[in-house]
């Protein structure tokens, strides 16, 4: 028998929808590309961690004598499993090692041998299979960042007087920014790093266009004329384009060195734009100039007036002057010599050490400027600078367009891998610095790579990134949808991004390039709106970091359905006409209408089908996962849909899950891709099932058995009552029985907001839209008592309480149930370690973990010490430091854990040695058996065949070519993990089998090594705990929360409300057949909010309940009103759900029909139990002595200024005085009042409020002496 799966009837009309990409690809693929562990080192691309190493190595010392070269890196298996890390508060990480080679290039040190070593570089947090990182026991997600792409951007702004100013900004991947901008006088300046400005022509001179002539030639602006008396006469009246200079050299003696130095001097004879007159000819001849430059006579030069204006402002005349001018601008000092001055520009923009556009920047630059510079040339070139200035001039003359900064071709995604690369870059650069220093210090001593490297450098950078970076976030784990959405989130905030305060409306707005890439609906409400968005369902991030979305290509009005969809980035999509996914088609895929509404950039032209380039692949391609889960989204207002998508992420997993009757067809994919459930790995039969584990016997061929080291049966452990980050509960239960046949990918369990392999965030409820005695006024909700009684909205929440035992200066703390001055009743549930027993019911104030800590007191006298020793009075020197239940905590203890560090004494050390030896012996036997197994299997496959020369990693031949394989020969090989899998025999099929066998052997051997390492560590070190902590005790308390008045509920359409009344079932309105409704919603919540989708859902849900069917109505492609009417008619229920209801109290029929049906409701994480709070006495603020505020601080209710006015208005002076003094900050008064209440005496007079004293001290701080007089 096959296990059950929910079948959904789909209303979709669009055929050929492609499969969704894996929803976690954004995280997992990015991380895999970063580490490239599956790839052999010689095949690794120049990306990720490998590239970061190559950028920082080789490292040489200052004299270039020693070189440290990087060869390869690898990681060892993690020490703990993910679950162990979560329980012990550890980081799930892998040890990173690099193979480094140290050699000497100096012939004097010929005795120095080349050393190759594997060096430990620290432990690096490793991604779990579900795309998260476990850091210090908490699951975290690194959110991808959406930032400005490197490249060149052209923009415009307006001066106060209305003049348009244009600018071009070059944003590099690393290095200084350079900006070219115009000012109101039509002069073009270059700004370096946004602060220092210089005329563009100065920059031109500095990069090699030394003379005016060279600069004017770039733009073809001048005519060169030979100087001769007669020749110049015909040019009289024309204007000079460049200065006429008189140049000479002066010699002077440098006083410091005594050298003779010659200096070039320039004198301006005629300035630019001087009209050539007769008198000038003589002056020009005297200078000895061979040629002069004149303005061209054609009218084309008007466009380039800005260059002439800039030359006028340019104070320099030669390359030397230009570089010195730039040096002075940037350094605010005179250049020491010409070379230093020249070096500054080279270093800033032309050195690949300091400056890089990155691959993306070069690509964008070439695209924008129409250049063809090689992709690996990642510094600025002269051509880049010239082309940018030319483009800017075109912009000024309205011959080019400015860039749209919010266009997705100008924004790119920095995924986890890239962010980690950057952090590794920082860490390795620091490490390189220390290595260089150590190399320089160790001159002639013999040293090895290990001596040079400090492993802490790298891991401290990486750990601070995961711990404190704004983009490394505590995972939202309320339900599977919240997890998956958090991993697919894109944030414009964070280092190198925007800040909330500075972001304007344009950045936050929906842009036409978001179509199919970023969801226009799902974004937070509040200050982050539009800055944090979600990736659309089909979107992918390409190698450059740009978001792509799939389309089907169209040729001559016919869609190519047979081909795979084509992924296009925003830039590639420009200028293309794209049709909707649901256009009518003929059977052969030809568009079946005369005119088509298409999308082209931000426009919607109506065009001929032959003009269409592409069509969308699916109607829901525009939205993210959350929005695609809202049925009938097309009938909802976008603002409400936004609330709906956000609230689905806050839905608490319920005790009894139930998938929606009206879904959208995406529910299964979300549940699968969230990696919460267990799926069958192939065809097979269920052998054993209980609440904790499932065992499946898989069908395998003889060959599969041959290359595997595992049994046919595989057992899966189910997660039971695991606490999530948000305190909700993951508890999986099997949905298959012994003897069932399972297929590959089939879901074996349910729970944690899933049912039968589908996402199930809430429950289907019988609903009536009608007012009920005013109790559902303003979005309040009326609920039937049956909902509470049947545990329909009951959820389990787990709290973790922990207590650390530290060693203090006065002695060690201790866990115990023997606590001073505490009754036996209070400690009855504690074990000998002071931990509460599993199953105990906890009430506020109960002791959860008993702990005593030494009390700091004056040293006892010798007599006291003696008496204490005799009578054992220990209570005097310890105080109670137990963990007690907080005021709102009640529940049942479901688990407890105690972790302890191993205590080392001589006997224990000896015992440890024995235990480790026994362990090693046990594992040696396991390794031997595994190898014997391998040899036997290998012999079965290739025994008697001729060897083709098998080599190991180092290229040494292990099995000689031409010999036949024998058992002896196979047994003689020491290490099978380092053999090349390749040509063992001449038969390719056998070679593949051997490769698979060796691969599986490596995995198995690795697992055993990991287990051995872990067990050894546990024996010798005990539990790994942070320093200074001897023991860590944890208690888990579960609370079963039923639905209560004050809990927040919501539908999927942004229809949220608070439970206002729980009504007896017999008092609820009922249908004609006597069925009472479960929930009554206010009809006034629908029309003004314009989320009519909930009404469609209600009606279709009722039809589904009656017909016993579940439906999928994909967004923008869902059920029409006609289809719903057909189903309601078939089910025998009234159209539109319009039904007469009867009053539960009187049995009378209500006058008007109401809409009745089945709606899917969620219980949200905002529960009254977490919010309700009361205080009589509690903690006070240190300075003002007023009560603290908030539930977390066990605070009081603030009685503010306006409340004081209210009491003043009533003339309630005594109440007011009491509130402002003894109930607040009159310290002496409140103590006396408490005493008076206890003793039953009359209330004393209030004293002076502490806040008055604070004011007095403030005034004294200002130097005013204030005396109080009676």
Swiss-Prot record:
SUPFAM superfamilies recorded:
beta and beta-prime subunits of DNA dependent RNA-polymerase (SSF64484)
Keywords of the record: DNA-directed RNA polymerase, Nucleotidyltransferase, Transcription, Transferase
Q: Its Enzyme Commission number?
A: 2.7.7.6
List the InterPro entries: DNA-dir_RNA_pol_bsu_ext_1_sf, DNA-dir_RNA_pol_bsu_external_1, DNA-dir_RNA_pol_su2, DNA-dir_RNAP_su2_dom, DNA-dir_RNAP_su2_hyb_sf, RNA_pol_bsu_bac, RNA_pol_bsu_CS, RNA_pol_bsu_protrusion
* Disulphide connectivity of cysteines: none
Q: Where is the signal peptide?
A: none
Pfam families attached here? Answer: RNA_pol_Rpb2_1, RNA_pol_Rpb2_2, RNA_pol_Rpb2_3, RNA_pol_Rpb2_45, RNA_pol_Rpb2_6, RNA_pol_Rpb2_7
Q: What is the catalytic activity of this protein? A: RNA(n) + a ribonucleoside 5'-triphosphate = RNA(n+1) + diphosphate
Q: Which GO terms describe its cellular component?
A: DNA-directed RNA polymerase complex
> Which Gene Ontology molecular function entries are recorded, alphabetically?
DNA binding; DNA-directed RNA polymerase activity; ribonucleoside binding
Write out the GO biological process terms.
DNA-templated transcription
| NCBIfam families per the UniProt record, alphabetical | PRK00405.1, rpoB
Describe, as the record does, how this protein assembles with itself and its partners. The RNAP catalytic core consists of 2 alpha, 1 beta, 1 beta' and 1 omega subunit. When a sigma factor is associated with the core the holoenzyme is formed, which can initiate transcription.
In the record, the note on similarity to other proteins reads: Belongs to the RNA polymerase beta chain family.
Q: Relate the protein's function as given in its record.
A: DNA-dependent RNA polymerase catalyzes the transcription of DNA into RNA using the four ribonucleoside triphosphates as substrates.
Name assigned to this protein: DNA-directed RNA polymerase subunit beta
Species of the source: Christiangramia forsetii (strain DSM 17595 / CGMCC 1.15422 / KT0803)
